[in-house]
């Protein structure tokens, strides 16, 4: 019988592939979740493209981003992003770091990313901008040191997304399903904001709309619906989807044929 850890590995591997299948992750980037029974650990794949991640690739790490059981395979160099956020934010149970092409223009230009349609409201009221130079001067732009991860976590603060200068974005969620929802719709919101900006003035959602729409979007129903949709799209892409068999409805009693009474035919 699968344990909670086995189930977590399965769903985390699927989340990696789902986000990649939707075009947000490519060869780089990573998705993690907090350990299902030990909040002082988190789960993360060995270093490989998210689209390739399988349950057996998932390993346990401490919040200092040290692997519990050493392996020969390479590990992600930026895993400190995840460990430091889990340290700083007990309410966060899943994290995604990505370099989506729709997000990068905001990381390059410094333009503020704002929710511009209802499903983008899960961005939250503020998306902070982190510049590694403020604390560390010129760097490789890779977040590989614990102090760099801690600086990024401070920049995230109580928010759910932080943009990283000339690098990408880091997204947080209270659950893995919420994280997938927020990550995918953040990228789509960014694309729409850029497209709308080309037409003229962009009017984002106001604070009340952002709060109300964000809360509505993250109800169990919408989150589960989106997860199922992206999950089936992944299965189709991987060639593992089997369409459900259509059920043949029984005829209602009123539609049954009533036998004609026996007797002589009437003469016309």
Give residue spans per PLM region.
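Glycine-rich flexible loops
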Residues: 1-268
């Amino acid at each position: 019988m699968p344990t909670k850890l086995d189930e977590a590995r399965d769903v985390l591997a699927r989340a990696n592939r789902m986000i990649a299948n939707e075009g947000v992750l490519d060869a780089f980037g990573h998705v993690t979740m907090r350990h299902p029974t030990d909040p002082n650990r988190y789960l993360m794949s060995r270093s490989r493209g998210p689209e390739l991640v399988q349950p057996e690739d998932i390993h346990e790490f401490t919040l200092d981003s040290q692997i519990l059981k050493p392996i020969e395979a390479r590990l992600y160099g930026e895993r400190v992003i995840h460990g430091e956020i889990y340290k700083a934010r007990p309410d966060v149970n899943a994290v995604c770091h990505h370099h989506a092409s729709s997000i990068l223009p905001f990381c390059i230009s410094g333009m503020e990313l704002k929710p511009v349609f209802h499903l983008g409201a899960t961005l939250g009221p503020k998306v902070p901008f982190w510049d590694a130079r403020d604390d560390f001067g010129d760097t490789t732009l890779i977040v590989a040191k614990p102090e760099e991860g801690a600086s990024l976590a401070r920049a995230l603060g109580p928010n759910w997304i932080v943009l990283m200068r000339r690098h990408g974005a880091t997204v947080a969620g209270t659950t893995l399903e919420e994280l997938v929802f927020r990550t995918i719709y953040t990228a789509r919101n960014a694309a729409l904001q850029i497209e709308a900006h080309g037409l003229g003035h962009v009017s984002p959602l106001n604070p009340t709309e952002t709060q109300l729409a964000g809360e509505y979007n993250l109800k169990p129903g919408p989150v589960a619906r989106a997860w199922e949709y992206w999950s089936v799209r992944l299965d189709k892409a991987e060639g593992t989807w089997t369409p459900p068999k259509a059920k043949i409805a029984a005829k209602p009693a009123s539609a049954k044929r009533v036998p004609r009474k026996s007797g002589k035919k009437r003469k016309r």
